[in-house]
């Protein structure tokens, strides 16, 4: 598996993890929800990058995707095609 394939898989897992956690949360205001999602994303990024030098280098870039991920979840939480498009868009 090359770097691009590993990154694609990582981003898919990240979005799936965020989406499943989001569905378990109570849906309060958007600002509260976004703050919670930021913490979830931080945690998932840290878990995925702790033991991997390749992803450790990408950590800062992944953190920059957090706002995008929050917007994506709020607007397209149940749209599979948008999920796939988002994965393609943020994958190099």
Curated annotation (Swiss-Prot):
Interacts with NSP2 and NSP5. It is found in: Host cytoplasm; Host mitochondrion. Belongs to the rotavirus A NSP6 family. The keyword Isomerase does not apply. Its main location: host cell. The keyword ATP-binding does not apply. Keywords: Host cytoplasm, Host mitochondrion. It comes from Rotavirus A (strain RVA/Monkey/United States/RRV/1975/G3P5B[3]) (RV-A). InterPro entries: Rotavirus_NSP6 (IPR006950). GO terms for cellular component: host cell mitochondrion. It holds the Pfam family Rota_NS6. It comes from the Viruses. This is Non-structural protein 6.
């Amino acid at each position: 598996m090359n770097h691009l394939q590993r990154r694609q898989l990582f981003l898919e897992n990240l979005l799936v993890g965020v989406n499943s956690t989001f569905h378990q949360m109570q849906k309060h205001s958007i600002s509260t929800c976004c703050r919670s999602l930021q913490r979830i994303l931080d945690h998932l990024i840290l878990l995925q990058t702790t033991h991997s030098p390749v992803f450790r280098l990408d950590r800062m870039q992944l953190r920059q995707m957090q706002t995008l991920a929050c917007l994506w979840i709020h607007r397209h939480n149940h749209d599979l095609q948008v999920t796939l498009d988002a994965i393609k868009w943020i994958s190099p």
